[in-house]
A protein has these predicted regions:
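P-loop NTP-binding site
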Residues: 63, 118-140
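C-terminal alpha-helix
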Residues: 108-120
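Short, contiguous clusters of charged residues that form electrostatic/catalytic patches at enzyme active sites
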Residues: 22, 26, 104-111
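Catalytic histidine-centered segment of alpha/beta-hydrolase-like enzymes
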Residues: 83-85
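C-terminal boundary of histidine-terminating zinc-finger modules
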Residues: 87-108
Length: 140
């Protein structure tokens, strides 16, 4: 962490996620105070494994938004069995379930990151998209 400029934390919508966040924030403060990297910042927090049907997920998001309103991403990654399935098929979530809620959410999180950093990806053209090696989604 001491070598990083910014920290982006994926945070599970669970109680232990909040405990882990508190520990990471303390470590970031210690790195600053020790002079190892005085400019290190907590760039953002992306809530993951969100299930809007549960009070716990909603409470965790509310707690994070209370203490870290500027860092909390608007995009929330939903709990999805497809995320766990993808690696067992040797695929990314974008290849395994391209139109699923999780794929869309991760794409939105990437867009939000780029927008926060005022970085805009060039439009996909034949010149800057790698050729597909084993399926049509390989360039995603």
């Amino acid at each position: 962490l001491a070598a990083a400029d910014e920290i982006l934390i994926p945070l599970q919508c669970e109680w232990f996620g909040l405990e882990g966040l508190a520990k990471i924030v303390r470590v970031i403060e210690q790195i600053r105070e020790a002079g190892a990297n005085p400019q290190i910042t907590l760039e953002g927090i992306i809530m993951t494994m969100y299930d809007g049907r549960t009070n716990l997920s909603r409470q965790v998001v509310e707690e994070v938004s209370t203490y870290f309103p500027a860092q909390l991403y608007n995009t929330v990654i939903p709990r999805s069995i497809r995320i766990g399935e993808a690696p067992s098929h040797g695929k990314t979530i974008f290849e395994h379930d391209p139109s699923g809620n999780a794929s869309i959410a991760y794409g939105n999180a990437a867009d939000e990151f780029l927008t926060r950093h005022k970085v805009f990806a060039p439009p996909a053209t034949a010149a800057n998209v790698p050729a597909a090696d084993h399926n049509d989604n390989a360039a995603l």
